[in-house]
Amino acid sequence: VAQLFHADAKKVAEARDQALKRWAKNPAVDHLIGRCLSRAYRFAESALHQRKALEFDAQYLPAKVQLCHDLLRLGEEEEAWKLAGAIREDDGYNIQAHNLGLLEKEMDGYVTKSFPDFILKMPKRDWPIYGERALQLLREAKALLAPKYGIDLKRPVLVEFFGEQSDFAIRTFGALGGQGMLGVCFGTVVTMNSPGSLANGRNNWESTLWHEFCHVITLSVTQNRMPRWLSEGISVYEERQRDSAWGMPMDATFREMTLNEEKLTPFSQLSGAFMKAKSQEEILFAYYESSQAVEYLLDTYGKHKFQGILRDLAAGKRVNDAITANCENVDEIEKRFSSFMTNKAKAFGAKADWNKPKPEDLNPFDESSFSEFLKKHPTSLWALQRHAEDAIKNKNWPELLQTGQKLVELVPEDFSGTSGYSLQVQALRQMKREEDEIVMLRRIAANASGAQSTFLRLIELDWPKKRWSEVLTHARRVTALNPFLLTAQKALAEAHAALNQPTESIHAWERVLVLDQSSAAQTHFRLAQLWKPTNAAKARRHLLDSLSLAPRNREGLEMLRHF
């Protein structure tokens, strides 16, 4: 096992022969080798070793189960389902095989859309809502990233969306668990939670899909031989290249962790950043730091040298050796990268005082103590945040607005829910200053991909004013979080129609028809109006459907008279 991750195939073969010396047909040897390879995402090699184990003992159950999982991760689903069925016949109590049987039945009801470049599988209800958008985004990613990283994908990429987290877990991990995971890539197979699942509205499924497809590219380039930090770092970096609001920008938490020597992982040890993480916060920081390392390498040494690192990884080199061979000594890079990270952290809110008060700075029994502290420390973020809380409690909106403005001056890069921008929005809304509120909301919307409440508020404010381009932009941002949200789909439909984009408006109304049967009469009527100039038969069909649900609709009856 120790020899597996070296490039010397001869040593690996010698170690295997030594393990088989006492028992030449011991299936456990190849099963163990394959299992370790599978953990390193080298599924094709793992499958070969599981087949060797089964040649030694055709009934060796651990090899059958592992081969089943490897086949699923290679996209060979038909063979995997058959093998899982055979395992159930041999061992009716095998939990993994039982769960795979349940998953197979569930996925039999999925819709499968096959194209030369992609195969998409998802619950039937999902395809009309976001299927075309997923395909469009995948093709955009492939057109951009494949030539950038110098690869031509020879086979279609399989992308599967799961409506239930438990189904996603069984398909992805072989067992229940993995809560919080949005998507996983195995090479040319991607599994994702549906944007209509429990995570809807909290995570940007479009950025997640872009992230996972980037893994398809980099894992293919390196033949699945790359450390997690580099793979994740490239994916997060490419998210930021696609949309500056994606890809984990610097925030107050990352700033604090970067400036903490115990939290910041040295460049040469990034391979351990994910393994040593003890909390969700530390895992997220590992993603962030990895993406910054990738950004540093690309900006400092250029695309061609970076591609050389990936080629060397595919040949079996260790990551630090590959970086040294293509760039310079890792120890030198480590020193400069540390300075790069520190300078970036210090630049975030550089004018602000990030220190919290000491116990002796405040007297909890003296109400004037806090006011005096704020006067002495006018740039203290802690004091300004508390002052904002007091203003909200007292409904002192002008004071809240002023405090928000001060926070924006101190930390203009912060667009979080507690930022100065958010405080100003709250104050302006209460003061009924809509146009000023819109200006502030748009600044947040342009920089925060997960700000669903902000996007919805902008739709609410721009729609009555018939600012259709803005309505369209914000509705698209909402559907990147939750395409099943009716408000956003109706906004898309109305905005496209107003902008003289009938085809797009028709598609949006068709999604509304799926999502909201209670207003089907009105939706069919709108579709009839949109189809009439180009397809009278479809228009008439929708009109009749509308009138069957609302026979007293005078506009509909008048329209029918003119057919």
Language model region names:
Residues 1, 14, 18, 29, ...:
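Beta/coil-rich, acidic/histidine-enriched accessory regions frequently appended to metallopeptidases
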Residues 1-103, 526-529:
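Alpha-helical protein-protein interaction scaffolds
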Residues 10, 73, 78-81, 226, ...:
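Amphipathic alpha-helical substructures
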